Design a protein with these regions (language model features):
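Helix-loop-helix hairpin linking two adjacent transmembrane segments in secondary transporters
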Residues: 52, 89-134
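Cytoplasmic helix-loop-helix junction between adjacent transmembrane helices
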Residues: 56-92
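Conserved MFS/SLC helix-loop-helix module at the cytosolic interface between two early adjacent transmembrane helices
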Residues: 12-48
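Pair of pore-lining "gating" transmembrane helices in MFS-fold secondary transporters
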Residues: 58, 160-180
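MFS-fold secondary transporters
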Residues: 40-44, 60, 132
Length: 218
């Protein structure tokens, strides 16, 4: 249930928060989302009940769309001949982080407990926000208008370009298959006859890192 709520939040963030990068400065959006992530992660770490965890997980999912803001930034600051490679590097980092985090969280959860992993994640988000404030330049928005007009323009793209309708379906099926595999695999490995702990289950993430690293080469 927690994983499902988090993914619902992620979808909400992709649909309603990522487009704000064309309306407001992306640096501010990223820092605000990092701040909310820190609060939500600390809330989960100190949560007294499952309902609090579910609510904070929804916020965590919504704010976890930050990497999707970095992808157009990488494209914007790249030379035309290097755009594909640089975007691929960012995507590789995103996918590698998803898989490597399973390994790290599994080990930390097994040794110290799951709450400690959320404390560590909050500290890492704080470090990331500091790096963004120091390194990322101010990028002026390129859309002049209201948020409602911005959202309408997105739907007009769906009507105008068939590729824009096709690519999200393909990506959604691929990512859905990916999440289904890894989510179910964790439960299966924890049951008979394996009875694996979170550290062993997390190690399975190493199997997919090689494929994630190859994204920059495809």
């Amino acid at each position: 249930l927690i994983a499902m709520i988090t993914q619902i939040g992620y979808a909400i963030g992709l649909l309603f928060i990522v487009p704000l990068g064309d309306l407001f400065q992306r640096k501010k959006i990223i820092i605000i989302n990092f701040s909310l992530l820190i609060l939500s992660l600390l809330t989960i770490a100190m949560a007294p009940s499952i309902n609090v965890i579910l609510g904070a997980s929804l916020v965590t999912g919504i704010c976890s769309m930050v990497p999707q803001i970095f992808i157009p930034i990488a494209s914007q600051f790249s030379r035309p001949e290097h755009k594909g490679r640089n975007v691929g590097i960012v995507v590789s980092g995103l996918l590698t982080g998803i898989l490597a985090s399973r390994v790290v969280s599994g080990l930390v959860g097994e040794i110290f407990g799951w709450r400690e992993m959320y404390y560590i994640a909050a500290v890492l988000m704080l470090l990331c926000s500091v790096v963004v404030m120091k390194v990322l330049p101010d990028i002026q928005p390129n859309f002049q208008g209201k948020y409602s007009e911005l959202m309408k323009s997105l739907f007009s793209l769906l009507k105008t370009y068939p590729q824009v309708r096709l690519y999200p379906i393909r990506a959604g099926l691929c990512f859905g298959s990916f999440l289904t595999l890894w989510s179910c695999l964790a439960f299966k490995m924890g049951q008979a006859p394996f009875h694996a702990g979170s550290n062993i289950i997390g190690m399975l993430g190493l199997c997919g890192i090689a494929g994630a690293l190859s994204a920059s080469l495809v």
